[in-house]
């Protein structure tokens, strides 16, 4: 288990130049690969609903992980309603819209979405939207939860990374810190 003192912080920014993703940290360009992870909530819209979380990470050659951005919302639709003539989103963005937007913004290698029965509509909507936009370069990988309790999966996956100081958050990422 990790503690607050295990949390590493980073200051810098992301850039894409000549077909390569970088984070710029301490004035140095560090080449990285970028990925998205998504844990969509599947419960109904209440004040106690779970959060849907979509996180963009960068990983460098030394396997250091930098959290670039995350979206954390309650009661997010699978996909937002769109104007049929312009394709412009009307109202609230959905999980699919956010994934596709972040995938393009950060030139991600792939996006992983937790694959449980209730999330199958997300995969269907992602495939439909990729087809509509002709964006077949966007790779979305289903991730089976594996039968262990969610808390155990989180701790086993992140504990070693945090305790060895290889996860770097921004100081303003309060939801991830607390």
How would you label these PLM feature ranges?
Residues 1-41:
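ATPase catalytic-site recognition across NTP-hydrolyzing enzymes
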Residues 22-29, 44-48, 101-105:
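Short, conserved, surface-exposed binding loops centered on an aromatic residue
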Residues 34-35, 51, 64, 166:
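A residue-level signal for beta-strand positions that form part of recognition/binding surfaces
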Residues 36-37, 56, 112:
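Structured core elements
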Residues 38-54:
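An active-site-proximal beta-strand-loop segment
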Residues 60-178:
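Mg2+-dependent endonuclease catalytic cores in nucleic-acid-processing enzymes, primarily RNase H-like
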């Amino acid at each position: 288990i990790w503690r607050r003192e295990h949390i590493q912080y980073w200051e810098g920014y992301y850039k894409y130049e000549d077909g390569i993703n970088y984070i710029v940290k301490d004035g140095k360009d560090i080449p990285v690969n970028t990925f998205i992870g998504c844990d969509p909530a599947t419960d109904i819209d209440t004040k106690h609903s779970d959060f849907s979380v979509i996180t963009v990470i960068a990983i460098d050659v030394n396997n250091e992980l930098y959290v670039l951005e995350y979206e954390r919302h309650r009661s997010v639709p699978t996909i937002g309603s769109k104007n049929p003539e312009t394709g412009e989103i009307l109202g609230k963005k959905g999980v699919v819209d956010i994934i596709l937007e972040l995938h393009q913004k950060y030139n991600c290698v792939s996006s992983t979405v937790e694959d449980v029965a209730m999330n199958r509509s997300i995969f269907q909507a992602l495939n439909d939207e990729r087809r509509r936009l002709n964006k077949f370069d966007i790779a979305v990988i289903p991730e089976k939860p594996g039968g262990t309790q969610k808390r155990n999966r989180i701790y086993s996956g992140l504990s070693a990374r945090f305790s060895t100081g290889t996860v770097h958050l921004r100081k303003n990422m309060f939801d991830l810190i607390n």
